[in-house]
Amino acid sequence: MAAPSLLNWRRVSSFTGPVPRARHGHRAVAIRELMIIFGGGNEGIADELHVYNTATNQWFLPAVRGDIPPGCAAHGFVCDGTRILVFGGMVEYGRYSNELYELQASRWLWKKVKPHPPPSGLPPCPRLGHSFSLYGNKCYLFGGLANESEDSNNNVPRYLNDFYELELQHGSGVVGWSIPVTKGVVPSPRESHTAVIYCKKDSGSPKMYVFGGMCGARLDDLWQLDLETMSWSKPETKGTVPLPRSLHTASVIGNKMYIFGGWVPHKGENTETSPHDCEWRCTSSFSYLNLDTTEWTTLVSDSQEDKKNSRPRPRAGHCAVAIGTRLYFWSGRDGYKKALNSQVCCKDLWYLDTEKPPAPSQVQLIKATTNSFHVKWDEVSTVEGYLLQLSTDLPYQAASSDSSAAPNMQGVRMDPHRQGSNNIVPNSINDTINSTKTEQPATKETSMKNKPDFKALTDSNAILYPSLASNASNHNSHVVDMLRKNEGPHTSANVGVLSSCLDVRTVIPETSVSSTVSSTQTMVTQQTIKTESSSTNGAVVKDETSLTTFSTKSEVDETYALPATKISRVETHATATPFSKETPSNPVATVKAGERQWCDVGIFKNNTALVSQFYLLPKGKQSISKVGNADVPDYSLLKKQDLVPGTGYRFRVAAINGCGIGPFSKISEFKTCIPGFPGAPSAVRISKNVEGIHLSWEPPTSPSGNILEYSAYLAIRTAQIQDNPSQLVFMRIYCGLKTSCIVTAGQLANAHIDYTSRPAIVFRISAKNEKGYGPATQVRWLQGNNKKAPLN
């Protein structure tokens, strides 16, 4: 966690959808990037379910159905996968509940469940302000406040310290309650406390930690329950213990329990406040307990003023939820202030990053042109942007810091991907190969701008910082379109390059270029693999990436892409120098042995970038980015350098959040293109027939001459794949001028089922002109969970 002075709170000021009314006594859980809020209230108790998508800044009200529970406050609320359990709470003043409801969030279906009572003893009585914690297939209920009076208007409070265990059924439903026999001194009765469960990674049993609460006075004690031995203990702690409190929140991220807000004792006298304020007040103090060392650390003290409104104001009865390493806080009660007959509640939503983000995946190539790359990487959750850098072995002219440039603003959101390497085998054992190096083929690529059906972010969020992304809309393109013809397995497509030789045995992966096409029935993966091609028998292909995309609305960006020569792998310790398009007249910038110069491409809001330029390093600098924090150089003061055709570049990317710039990804290598070879076949279709399947395609949109023939290949099972599943072996199943072929059931019986993403049979189709073979369209025919019979 950052030092107290470096905490970087963020208030979410831009969002869409129906915002829930401000409230207190509500609860929240997280399912992936969703924050789900239920209950609480101010002017009456709320009974609706609200969802906030932290990735799109969007509130929405799901259409729930089934046994919808009544509104409640100060209830138990836990999440097990995609199901949520609600227990107890106040349903109206003086009337509490002990009913249990289950919500299947995948269908927004409520169900009232009736667990069996304990073998000995009574089930939990109606209560509020209890803790309800999940670990494994069990929920643990502790404490709360009950009403001893049967008359809800005559409230007789009774504080509880009973302990129950609720066993869950897998997926849906519950088994029943039990009352574990515990050892040691039991914590005193209390309500509005917090309880979290934590288990050390290396060793140790899971432990439940209870902190604070209320039993006539606020508490600051910490209790530990070993869930294996059922032994209570009071661990000794170091550091400054937070003030006694209730109605606070406790959230676990890593090995830390973060405590925020709540009611605390009022320090000092203020004659302008009410008698209540002199006794208790809300706080915005923020601390964490290291659960491995039981040491408290204060991040924001109770006495720390906030004149700039740079963090959440004091509150109690709010909700807090951890999504990744980010904490979200919403609403809550603002002390004893009142508006008419209601409490004043906070309406704001805040978040705080607790750690720097992890390294993203390697940069992946979507498409390449003679002077640009369209690249992507896997999204990292809860980040604010990405720093993309490149490096090259070619020398370039060192830049002086007084040159200026006006960077463009660009950014596109893409979907997850997979990557692998591949081999191609001849039709028979007697086939041989002679590998030779020749000219580079040119490939033609297509990219897609995915447009989700919902508005993900406001327009102002398209790009976080200036970048060197460039528009490639002035180029031509091809599209790979997979359509499922019947109710058989789904299909997906990749674009890849095969050699000009028909009897190819070995293929070493190089680079890939991807594009996507929407369909309500198919998942499409497209990948272009660069080859060294010749008229003789042989090819060397180096496959870097593939891109998997789910159904979205798409537009086509048209560009030429280039299959590049094989790029020599250079380890991260290799020496590199920057380059220039023209012979430099100034001295070339040098790099110390064992170091590589990295130049910023820009900082991007989303996980894709169009790269046609980068920023030159000032003389004597190894990097222009301040990796230690989120501050970046003023790119307007730096000179830009265009990418050069036929040149290899290395890329790396790092994610940025409120704690700064995280570690960089592993290095990827790509090469700009050289024009001339045919594009990849497009509009691939697969349909079943009596012989097997019918495979058809459309000619390349840019043949760059006459198409002489097509070749189709099938990935087959071999012992080599069993040893290295990521390295596919292909057998040619068709060669000719027709744009279709039959794949027999006998051939399919030998097909390899690729499990790199979803199970699929893999085909490749490529076209040949006078220069040789261009990129191949790689087709993944999705098989569901069927491992053996693709035609069943």
Swiss-Prot record:
Main location as per UniProt: cytoplasm
InterPro entries in UniProt: FN3_dom, FN3_sf, Gal_Oxase/kelch_b-propeller, HCF1/2, Ig-like_fold, Kelch-typ_b-propeller
Residue intervals of the Fibronectin type-III domain: 359-449, 583-675, 677-787
GO cellular component: cytoplasm; cytosol; histone methyltransferase complex; MLL1 complex; MLL1/2 complex; nucleoplasm; nucleus; plasma membrane
Keyword Cytoplasm attached: yes
Domain of life: Eukaryota
Ranges where the record places region Disordered: 399-447
One of the Pfam families matching this protein, by short name: Kelch_HCF
Subcellular location: Cytoplasm; Nucleus
Subunit field text: Binds KMT2A/MLL1. Component of the MLL1/MLL complex, at least composed of KMT2A/MLL1, ASH2L, RBBP5, DPY30, WDR5, MEN1, HCFC1 and HCFC2. Interacts with TASOR.
Protein's name according to its UniProt entry: Host cell factor 2
Gene, per the UniProt record: HCFC2
